[in-house]
Amino acid sequence: MQAARIDRYIKKQEGLDSLTREDIERIQLEKLNRLLGAQRLRNGFYKDLPGGLGSLGELKELPFTTGRDVAENAAGMLMTSQADIRKIITEHTSGTTGRAKRVFYSEGDCEDTIGLFMAGLGEMTGAGGRVMICMPFSGPGSLGELIAEAIRRIGGSPIRAGAGLSY
């Protein structure tokens, strides 16, 4: 049986020959601890979190980030330099009042997302495939554009039919 594309993607990203549940949990904990350590030094929104965890089970002890946190502290949540930001998504509240939420994405974030989409979409289509994308196309780095790029990279043809486009 051939491994799922997402498994092959993770193995390639992590330089592994095989992938077990234990490998995944070890990778998750290592990456989380690296992130926690770096954010503690940045003195931003996450500065009061612990510098690392002993197990993934300790995640439940961390405070949950709320929509209000995102709306009020977007710049303090940056995990990279502002110069590295490629895409900013602004999400307005469902009501008529309240601050918009802003989420920032670096070039690396967008490339990682495309790679993940390639792994997932590659299970359903490939070279010569045609895929209709009914997602927002709000400019470079938008969800629709990232999906379209993933389809192009696996040799398919994206059919753009999302918000902001006519059918």
Task: Show which residues each predicted segment covers.
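Nucleotide 5′-phosphate-binding alpha/beta core
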Residues: 1-92, 98-112, 119
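Short, charged low-complexity intrinsically disordered segments located at boundaries
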Residues: 62-71, 123, 141-150
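AMP-binding/adenylate-forming
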Residues: 107-120, 130-167
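Short helix-loop-beta connector
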Residues: 125-129
